[in-house]
């Protein structure tokens, strides 16, 4: 892509949105604490094959985002912005990719720029592209795979460059989220090819074989990691990645994973999905429904949105963040419908003063809306540290670090994933305990031993609460062994 003036402006706008005040707040919530903790443990331990959280293998997802986070820590140190860098770069790449591919598909500069800007300013996309996690990378992989597939499918001849980009997208998506990274682009491609076959009333075998063959190519990086993981952890480790944490989450058999919601969960979330452009997206879907048979371009993006939405509704495990992979399609549909609205306004400008005003001044009005949205996001970025008190587990880590600096030995009893923040902030591995017996042995060994527990009352084990740190609804107690009065 040539760096034209519109492209440069889009790059600067998206860069400002995604990188402004990226490290001004602590790790917030369980996801950031968990992922940052795993990345730091990977960097400290030197084990880049088996992701581990608080000394236990953590095989919920493949390690691409963890590798990138650990590399950023290695390059820039344990900075908050460093562990968010991979997500922000993935978001920036996704926006620029959408603009470039829409231009290659022959869409006007104004429309391509509008769609990309809508993506960059879509609330769910902006928020997740500024967090530690793998969802921005998943979205980048899915977007690259689907846009490259559509570009390649427009030509009967083999377009090797586009198909290699497709394989790269599959590699990124599957190394980020495993089976889900294959299912999200896969369901779109299947439904789109099925619709095209029904519309054309013929089955073109090469249209089905090419994505299948290049999907196999894209799976090679994941398979290499799984082979190395098998050598380390055996079939159980591979099964945990591919079956327990993928099929189990989809079917609901993996109960411990949580996030199980009723089938209508995402329907309830529609009013807040794809804000602030969701109304344009939904009206666009309705408006374009009659044009899909004769317009493969619109058909593809509508299928992208609807097919993935249906798939996510079928899955037992549901989270609003999973809709991030749909945002590029939502942005394109919203931008296309905005063009339809502008055309309608121009057609009615002779009969309506309002239509004439909106038509004549649509550029400054659109610019004003964009400036307002961007200003709101920048304000939210500056406001983010205010959520630390209820969302950040840094105070727990700070207390652990303080005690260790005083010569105390601290251990964590059955720590949950939120205490991954302790590993990140301390930049060292932590001692963990798995049972009450281990806790008792640890505390008896020395009066300088302190444990972090969530419940300070353990039958048969007298504990003295040294300190308590609360984060939202979570309470962590720093305890030592109580000294009993000899006279009692």
Which stretches of residues belong to each language-model region?
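Short, charged/polar, Gly/Pro-enriched secondary-structure boundary elements
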Residues: 484-488
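Cytosolic juxtamembrane regulatory segments of multi-pass membrane proteins
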Residues: 254-257, 359, 407-413
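Exposed alpha-helical structural elements
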Residues: 236-237, 246, 353, 395, ...
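Membrane-integral, polyisoprenol-dependent glycosyltransferases
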Residues: 1-346, 383-386, 423, 466-479
